[in-house]
Amino acid sequence: MEEKAKMRRLSTWKLKLRMFLATVLLFGLIYAILMVVGSILGLGGPLFYALLGFGVIFLQYLISPKIVELTMNVHYVSEAEAPRLHAMVDELARRAGIPKPMVGIAEIALPNAFAFGRTKADGRVCVTRGILNLLDEEELRAVLGHEISHIKHSDMIVMTLVSAVPLICYYIFWSTVFSRDDEANLVGIAALIAYFIGQLIVLFISRTREYYADQGSVEIGGQPHKLASALYKLVLRLSPVQQGRPETGRGCQGLLPE
């Protein structure tokens, strides 16, 4: 059991590292190319970096589904391959009043489900092999309702747009780092402050959208206890005790009866 826990932790670590490195490499390369182009054209002021931020966000919007598919090892399944999964997604999408999303499975042990895509018409719902093995059918339906609610509320677009603000502020700050102009330095400091404030706002909005998705799952699925049960199983599976580290999972031991 301890060996399986170690393998699960290693798989999770590799997955996160792969996602991080792919994102950093891609957008780092894009940013470097645009920096060189801007330098050749004699561009380098705050306006250029603001436009650069918009460009990066737009590019992210266009290619982010492909990044998710590659990093999460997603493959889409037909109704013949996964009839029950398709039936649940179809029913929940009809109740939510949106087109049926594409249905995918990620062949990883980490229990997870996620929605992605550019628009409601381009929505995709994916579950991992780990969550399929962990939850019963009604719990999985509740989790799928949560993800479909993200598509219904256009959360992918909303988060892309709100994330643009701190990113643009960061680019503006970077454009003033090596400037000797006092006014430019003041602009840079203001942009840096705005960046940190913007990040906090983005985190708040993200958490709020998660609450809305929970509510949406109940509205279209009607089983809040199943969503709670699914979340409990997910937390328990990812807890230190389940991962073979009981010594780090004793923080709530005093709440348990002797």
From Swiss-Prot:
Domain of life: Archaea
Residues of the signal peptide: none
Chief location of this protein within or outside the cell: membrane
Family, similarity comment: Belongs to the peptidase M48B family.
Residues where Zn(2+) binds: 146, 150, 210
Cellular component terms (Gene Ontology): plasma membrane
Keywords: Cell membrane, Hydrolase, Membrane, Metal-binding, Metalloprotease, Protease, Transmembrane, Transmembrane helix, Zinc
Source species: Methanothermobacter thermautotrophicus (strain ATCC 29096 / DSM 1053 / JCM 10044 / NBRC 100330 / Delta H)
Listed EC numbers: 3.4.24.-
Subcellular location(s) per record: Cell membrane
Protein name, per record: Protease HtpX homolog
